[in-house]
Amino acid sequence: MTNKVRTRFAPSPTGYMHVGNLRTALYAYLIAKHDNGDFILRIEDTDQERLVEGALDVIYNTLKITGLSHDEGPDIGGPVGPYVQSERRNIYIEYAEKLIEKGEAYYCFCSKERLDMLRANSEALKRPFRYDKHCIDLSKEEIDKKIAEGVPYVIRQKNPTTGSTSFHDEIYGDISVDNSELDDMILIKSDGLPTYNFANVVDDHLMGITHVVRGSEYLSSSPKYNRLYEAFGWDVPIYVHCPPIMKDEHHKLSKRNGDASFEDLMAKGYLKEAILNYIALLGWNPGGEKEVFSMEELIEAFNYRNINKAPAVFDTKKLKWMNGEYIRALSLDKFHEMALPYYEEALTRDLDTKKISELLHTRVEVLNEIPEQLDFFNNLLEYSPKMYIHKKMKTTYENSLKSLEEVLPKLEALENWTFENIKEVCMNLVKELEVKNGVVLWPIRTAVSGKQFTPGGAFEIADILGKEETLERIKIGIDKLKALQ
């Protein structure tokens, strides 16, 4: 292998794309692309019981949607395949046997019952479970006999009980662990498949991975990884352990607890660019005030040494704000295209949706806010006459009624129903009555919408509703106000 930077994203196909997994993929991608390196996709499916049908498609689709394009992987191949761990079974067995020859691993024939008893004893003593090395000194004859008899076995790593193992992480610094704390972890399971930990080390070496990006929960396993690298005489890759993502101060974000996945966020109307931008900042500090980054800018700016140790809190409000920034940066045509499915779902009347998009483009932060802003376009909801009273607009029941009664015949006489003509009629009435704009415009907006807050003013709403519906709603407003007299 060359000195080229090579990173990997190695998910297990066990369900949705959790935000933490996506951040790992993003950081691995950014590290590789910052130095014109390779980003590899590897599928870790050694835990067959946890596999979920369709989850592999989720992984491929997410990488495709987000633009985190891999240079090598199961679907496109590459020079160091196969890229699916279950297809590499013989490779792992070969390397496990090399460790046995070196005296760095051993066969373990302990039954499930014996291991359960050891676990129960550990729990009773409130100690972490560690295998007691019962099989470590079996002779070759004993081993051959048991294998010939078909006794199930695993292959375990042989760790020392004295001294310490040290490793360096780019985020957490130098870490040293007493070897007495290291369990003789299983390398090859009784079904012949490797454990996650063993497969990782073998694959990362054989695939030339230079930077290993993963969550900080794997810090505790790193000494055992290092012992494997040393046993094989391999170079240790650069470790980049990322801090956990928290849903709040005390709870980690977790797909098992139903916290938002990438698919969930997309379904709620967040833009993929905003999600990636926000996730990039969960633990990484670019320095300076800038927070909105394109993918090209992220690739250029990303330095993994600026990742923080402190847990990052997933702040939905901040994500929402950032998504709003991205929506406002869209062209009107692009926003309209993205809004159309929401209009089809929410609107029951045939209206000019392009005009609605002009109103909403700068007023929504998440696309799924669109339907709640459209209800009054379908029909006039019941509202209280008190809405006509607005202190700032200086409106009362009396002057609101006067404004509506005065504007009604003028709008009825309007032959060409356009925004400009509606505006001209209303503003002429303001001059005619010698009042502030709000005295005329607030009652009209209230009458045509029945809402205190709308994504547009009186002119825009009347233009979109059309002449007949606008006049009908103004008449209803007049009746409401007359009923108070």
From Swiss-Prot:
A motif ('HIGH' region) lies at residues 11-21. Monomer. Gene3D superfamilies: 1.10.10.350, HUPs. GO terms for molecular function: ATP binding; glutamate-tRNA ligase activity; tRNA binding; zinc ion binding. InterPro entries: aa-tRNA-synth_I_cd-bd, aa-tRNA-synth_I_codon-bd_sub2, aa-tRNA-synth_I_CS, aa_tRNA-synth_I_cd-bd_sf, Glu-tRNA-ligase_bac/mito, Glu/Gln-tRNA-synth, Glu/Gln-tRNA-synth_Ib_cat-dom, GluQ/Sye. A motif ('KMSKS' region) lies at residues 252-256. Binds 1 zinc ion per subunit. It catalyses: tRNA(Glu) + L-glutamate + ATP = L-glutamyl-tRNA(Glu) + AMP + diphosphate. It comes from Clostridium botulinum (strain Okra / Type B1). This is Glutamate--tRNA ligase. Belongs to the class-I aminoacyl-tRNA synthetase family. Glutamate--tRNA ligase type 1 subfamily. PANTHER family: GLUTAMATE--TRNA LIGASE (PTHR43311), GLUTAMATE--TRNA LIGASE, MITOCHONDRIAL-RELATED (PTHR43311:SF2). CDD domains: GluRS_core (cd00808). It comes from the Bacteria. The gene is gltX. It is found in: Cytoplasm. Zn(2+) binds at residues 108, 110, 135, 137. One of its GO terms (cellular component) is cytoplasm.
